[in-house]
Amino acid sequence: MPTLHTPRRFYLLSVLILLSAMLFTHCGGGGGGDTNGTTSSGGASGASGASGAGGTTTGSGPASGAGGGGATGSGSAGTGMSSGGTAMAATHDVLTYHNDIARTGQNLNETVLTPANVNTTTFGKVGFFAVDGKVDAQPLFVESLAIAGGTHNVLYVVTEHDSVYALDADSGTPLWQVSMLGAGETPSDDLGCGQITREIGITSTPVIDRSRGAHGTIFLVAMSKDASGGYHQRVHALDLASGTEVLNGPTEVAASYPGNGANSSNGRVVFAPAAYAERAGLLLLGGVVYTTWTSHCDEGAYTGWIMGYSADSLQQTAVLNVTPNGSGGAIWMSGAGPASDGASIYLLDANGTFDTTLNSGGMPAQGNFGNAFLKLGTAGGLAVADYFAMSSTVQESKADEDLGSGGALVLPDVTDANGVVQHLALGTGKDDIVYVVNRDSMGKFNAAGDQIYQEIQEQLRGGEFGMPAYFNGRVYFGSVNDNLKAFTLTNALLSTAPTAQTRMAFAYPGTTPSISANGSANGIVWAAENGNMAALHAFDPATLAELYNSNQMGTRDQFGAGNKFITPMITNGKVYVGTTNGVAVFGLLKG
């Protein structure tokens, strides 16, 4: 069972709070691109410019779990669609990857940070919260939580050492810490590969539901290795105020699915925990926590899995394999979480088997959807409802130029020149082509040429290892060795060339931008730069002129080596950046 470490001065009060409440309530796919953790920083950042109880089922996708509660989000408004915020979400909460289930990356409730005060004179590093391992997942934030004998703004941080921390978001004071390791277990080894190194514990961004349980619940996936050499993947649900396991968790991840693909037996492909890692962020939608699985260092026979777990019970409620009669097709998206419009799920699948022979409905005849932009239906279980695959998808998979290195973004509803409301999503991967799909008719596969809403070529370079962000009619991309670029959305079409770009370029793995703003005003585009000396950057959203970077003042704001696939999290006047050994915190300087 997990071990709980609570600071002494808070322990008794925390237990009393919990007891009182109880009286009233019950990768692969990444291919060659997912490699070493840090690179040279470049010159751009200078002054210039144990098994769980029951609940796991196997099968071909039983009915999706019951239970109320929508998806979680940051509470931000103005995206033109439901943000999925829970009923109890506070103004500054950040409860899921990239702020909302559409994965727009925008926090529209930031009233402290503005373009006028984000500069080297008034803004900088205000703290560093040390933890016991790498922070690959985006930190999450809960405002005004009753915890540890008081009310705190709480930062939730997970590490590759299989630890979960609840920290006071302002001071960094530990409120509780819990380990996900069972007796005699360690985090997984990295199998001598640099994809996730040096240990693998909790890689993906968790998801929080404040309305579930006595104090709210954080859901996460942790990987471990036991003393006999066996690997485990488990879904956990922890009480926000105490860190104790709830919902009879954890649940051991196990699954099979009809098919004769990689690692199949007797007509079913089987999920082998040692072969997989949970890289992509979790999605909470309709009372179900969705997990998506990538290969563990591209070792062994693997396929593309999506699984759903009830947010009420942690029982497995849905299983889908998108390459059941083939191989590959893992889902990793450089850490981005699957996106949703509140009903369906959108994701980019990595290189793997794709059937160019289609059935009468235009679907791959053997059910293999490797290297494709997928729309998943959730009613009655998981199923591919629609998809788009490039006419060159097979060739791109063979060349490791797959789509799955990037994440999908659901755009707000937009109106075209004819007054028609369009429902769009977009994504790009290693081929640097921006694919904009109509969510109502994505285009499927056509060997003669792509049948797609819009396609923009030759404007990005280096491959996308992350995902874009959206704000005020602009979409921002940060691909490898490329400038951060803005494309403007007009009459439901993206500009065919960037309308603004930064002067600097971002080395591998590029950057996943995030946005802070107060509604449509005081917008700032934030981006983390990887490297031996990493950096946090802030840009004007219209011009992408640099407002600030953390290397401009010598060592004052520096925070050491970078982590790949890091997404800055901005809320309540602070910017939180995951690092190799903690979280760097930025805000307004005192005095």
Q: Where are these predicted regions, by residue range?
A:
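Mobile, glycine-rich extracellular loop/lid and propeptide segments
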Residues: 90-415, 422-445, 457, 461-487, ...
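Membrane-interfacial loop- and helix-cap regions that link adjacent transmembrane helices
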Residues: 486-501
